[in-house]
Amino acid sequence: MITKEEAQKIAKLARLKFEKDIVEKFSTQLSTIMNMINILNEIDCKDIEPLTSVSNMNARMREDTVTSSDLSNKLFDNVSGNSAKLAKEVKYFITPKVVE
């Protein structure tokens, strides 16, 4: 059983603030949770293989390949107007002023 003092310490560590009348309820709930965890700890799982997924499907692996991800040239090919050349050089979109 978790005491009120332990419950207050846990609440403080979790940065929770409880009224005094709630601390007893909190300690009871924590005790119940700890009892459930203790029951789970008693289960013998030595011969059970750990799950990596809840489904039986296997993840298909693929070879890692290095590809060029610099799409800026394609992107800036769409820039038109007087600022197109400068936009391609500095790799920025040049727009009219929108905030005064």
From Swiss-Prot:
<dbReference type="GO" id="GO:0006412">
    <property type="term" value="P:translation"/>
</dbReference>
<dbReference type="InterPro" id="IPR036113">
    <property type="entry name" value="Asp/Glu-ADT_sf_sub_c"/>
</dbReference>
<comment type="subunit">
    <text>Heterotrimer of A, B and C subunits.</text>
</comment>
<keyword id="KW-0547">Nucleotide-binding</keyword>
<keyword id="KW-0436">Ligase</keyword>
<dbReference type="InterPro" id="IPR003837">
    <property type="entry name" value="GatC"/>
</dbReference>
<keyword id="KW-0648">Protein biosynthesis</keyword>
<dbReference type="GO" id="GO:0050567">
    <property type="term" value="F:glutaminyl-tRNA synthase (glutamine-hydrolyzing) activity"/>
</dbReference>
<dbReference type="GO" id="GO:0005524">
    <property type="term" value="F:ATP binding"/>
</dbReference>
<comment type="function">
    <text>Allows the formation of correctly charged Asn-tRNA(Asn) or Gln-tRNA(Gln) through the transamidation of misacylated Asp-tRNA(Asn) or Glu-tRNA(Gln) in organisms which lack either or both of asparaginyl-tRNA or glutaminyl-tRNA synthetases. The reaction takes place in the presence of glutamine and ATP through an activated phospho-Asp-tRNA(Asn) or phospho-Glu-tRNA(Gln).</text>
</comment>
<protein>
    <recommendedName>
        <fullName>Glutamyl-tRNA(Gln) amidotransferase subunit C</fullName>
        <ecNumber>6.3.5.-</ecNumber>
    </recommendedName>
</protein>
<dbReference type="GO" id="GO:0050566">
    <property type="term" value="F:asparaginyl-tRNA synthase (glutamine-hydrolyzing) activity"/>
</dbReference>
<comment type="similarity">
    <text>Belongs to the GatC family.</text>
</comment>
<dbReference type="GO" id="GO:0006450">
    <property type="term" value="P:regulation of translational fidelity"/>
</dbReference>
<dbReference type="Pfam" id="PF02686">
    <property type="entry name" value="GatC"/>
</dbReference>
<keyword id="KW-0067">ATP-binding</keyword>
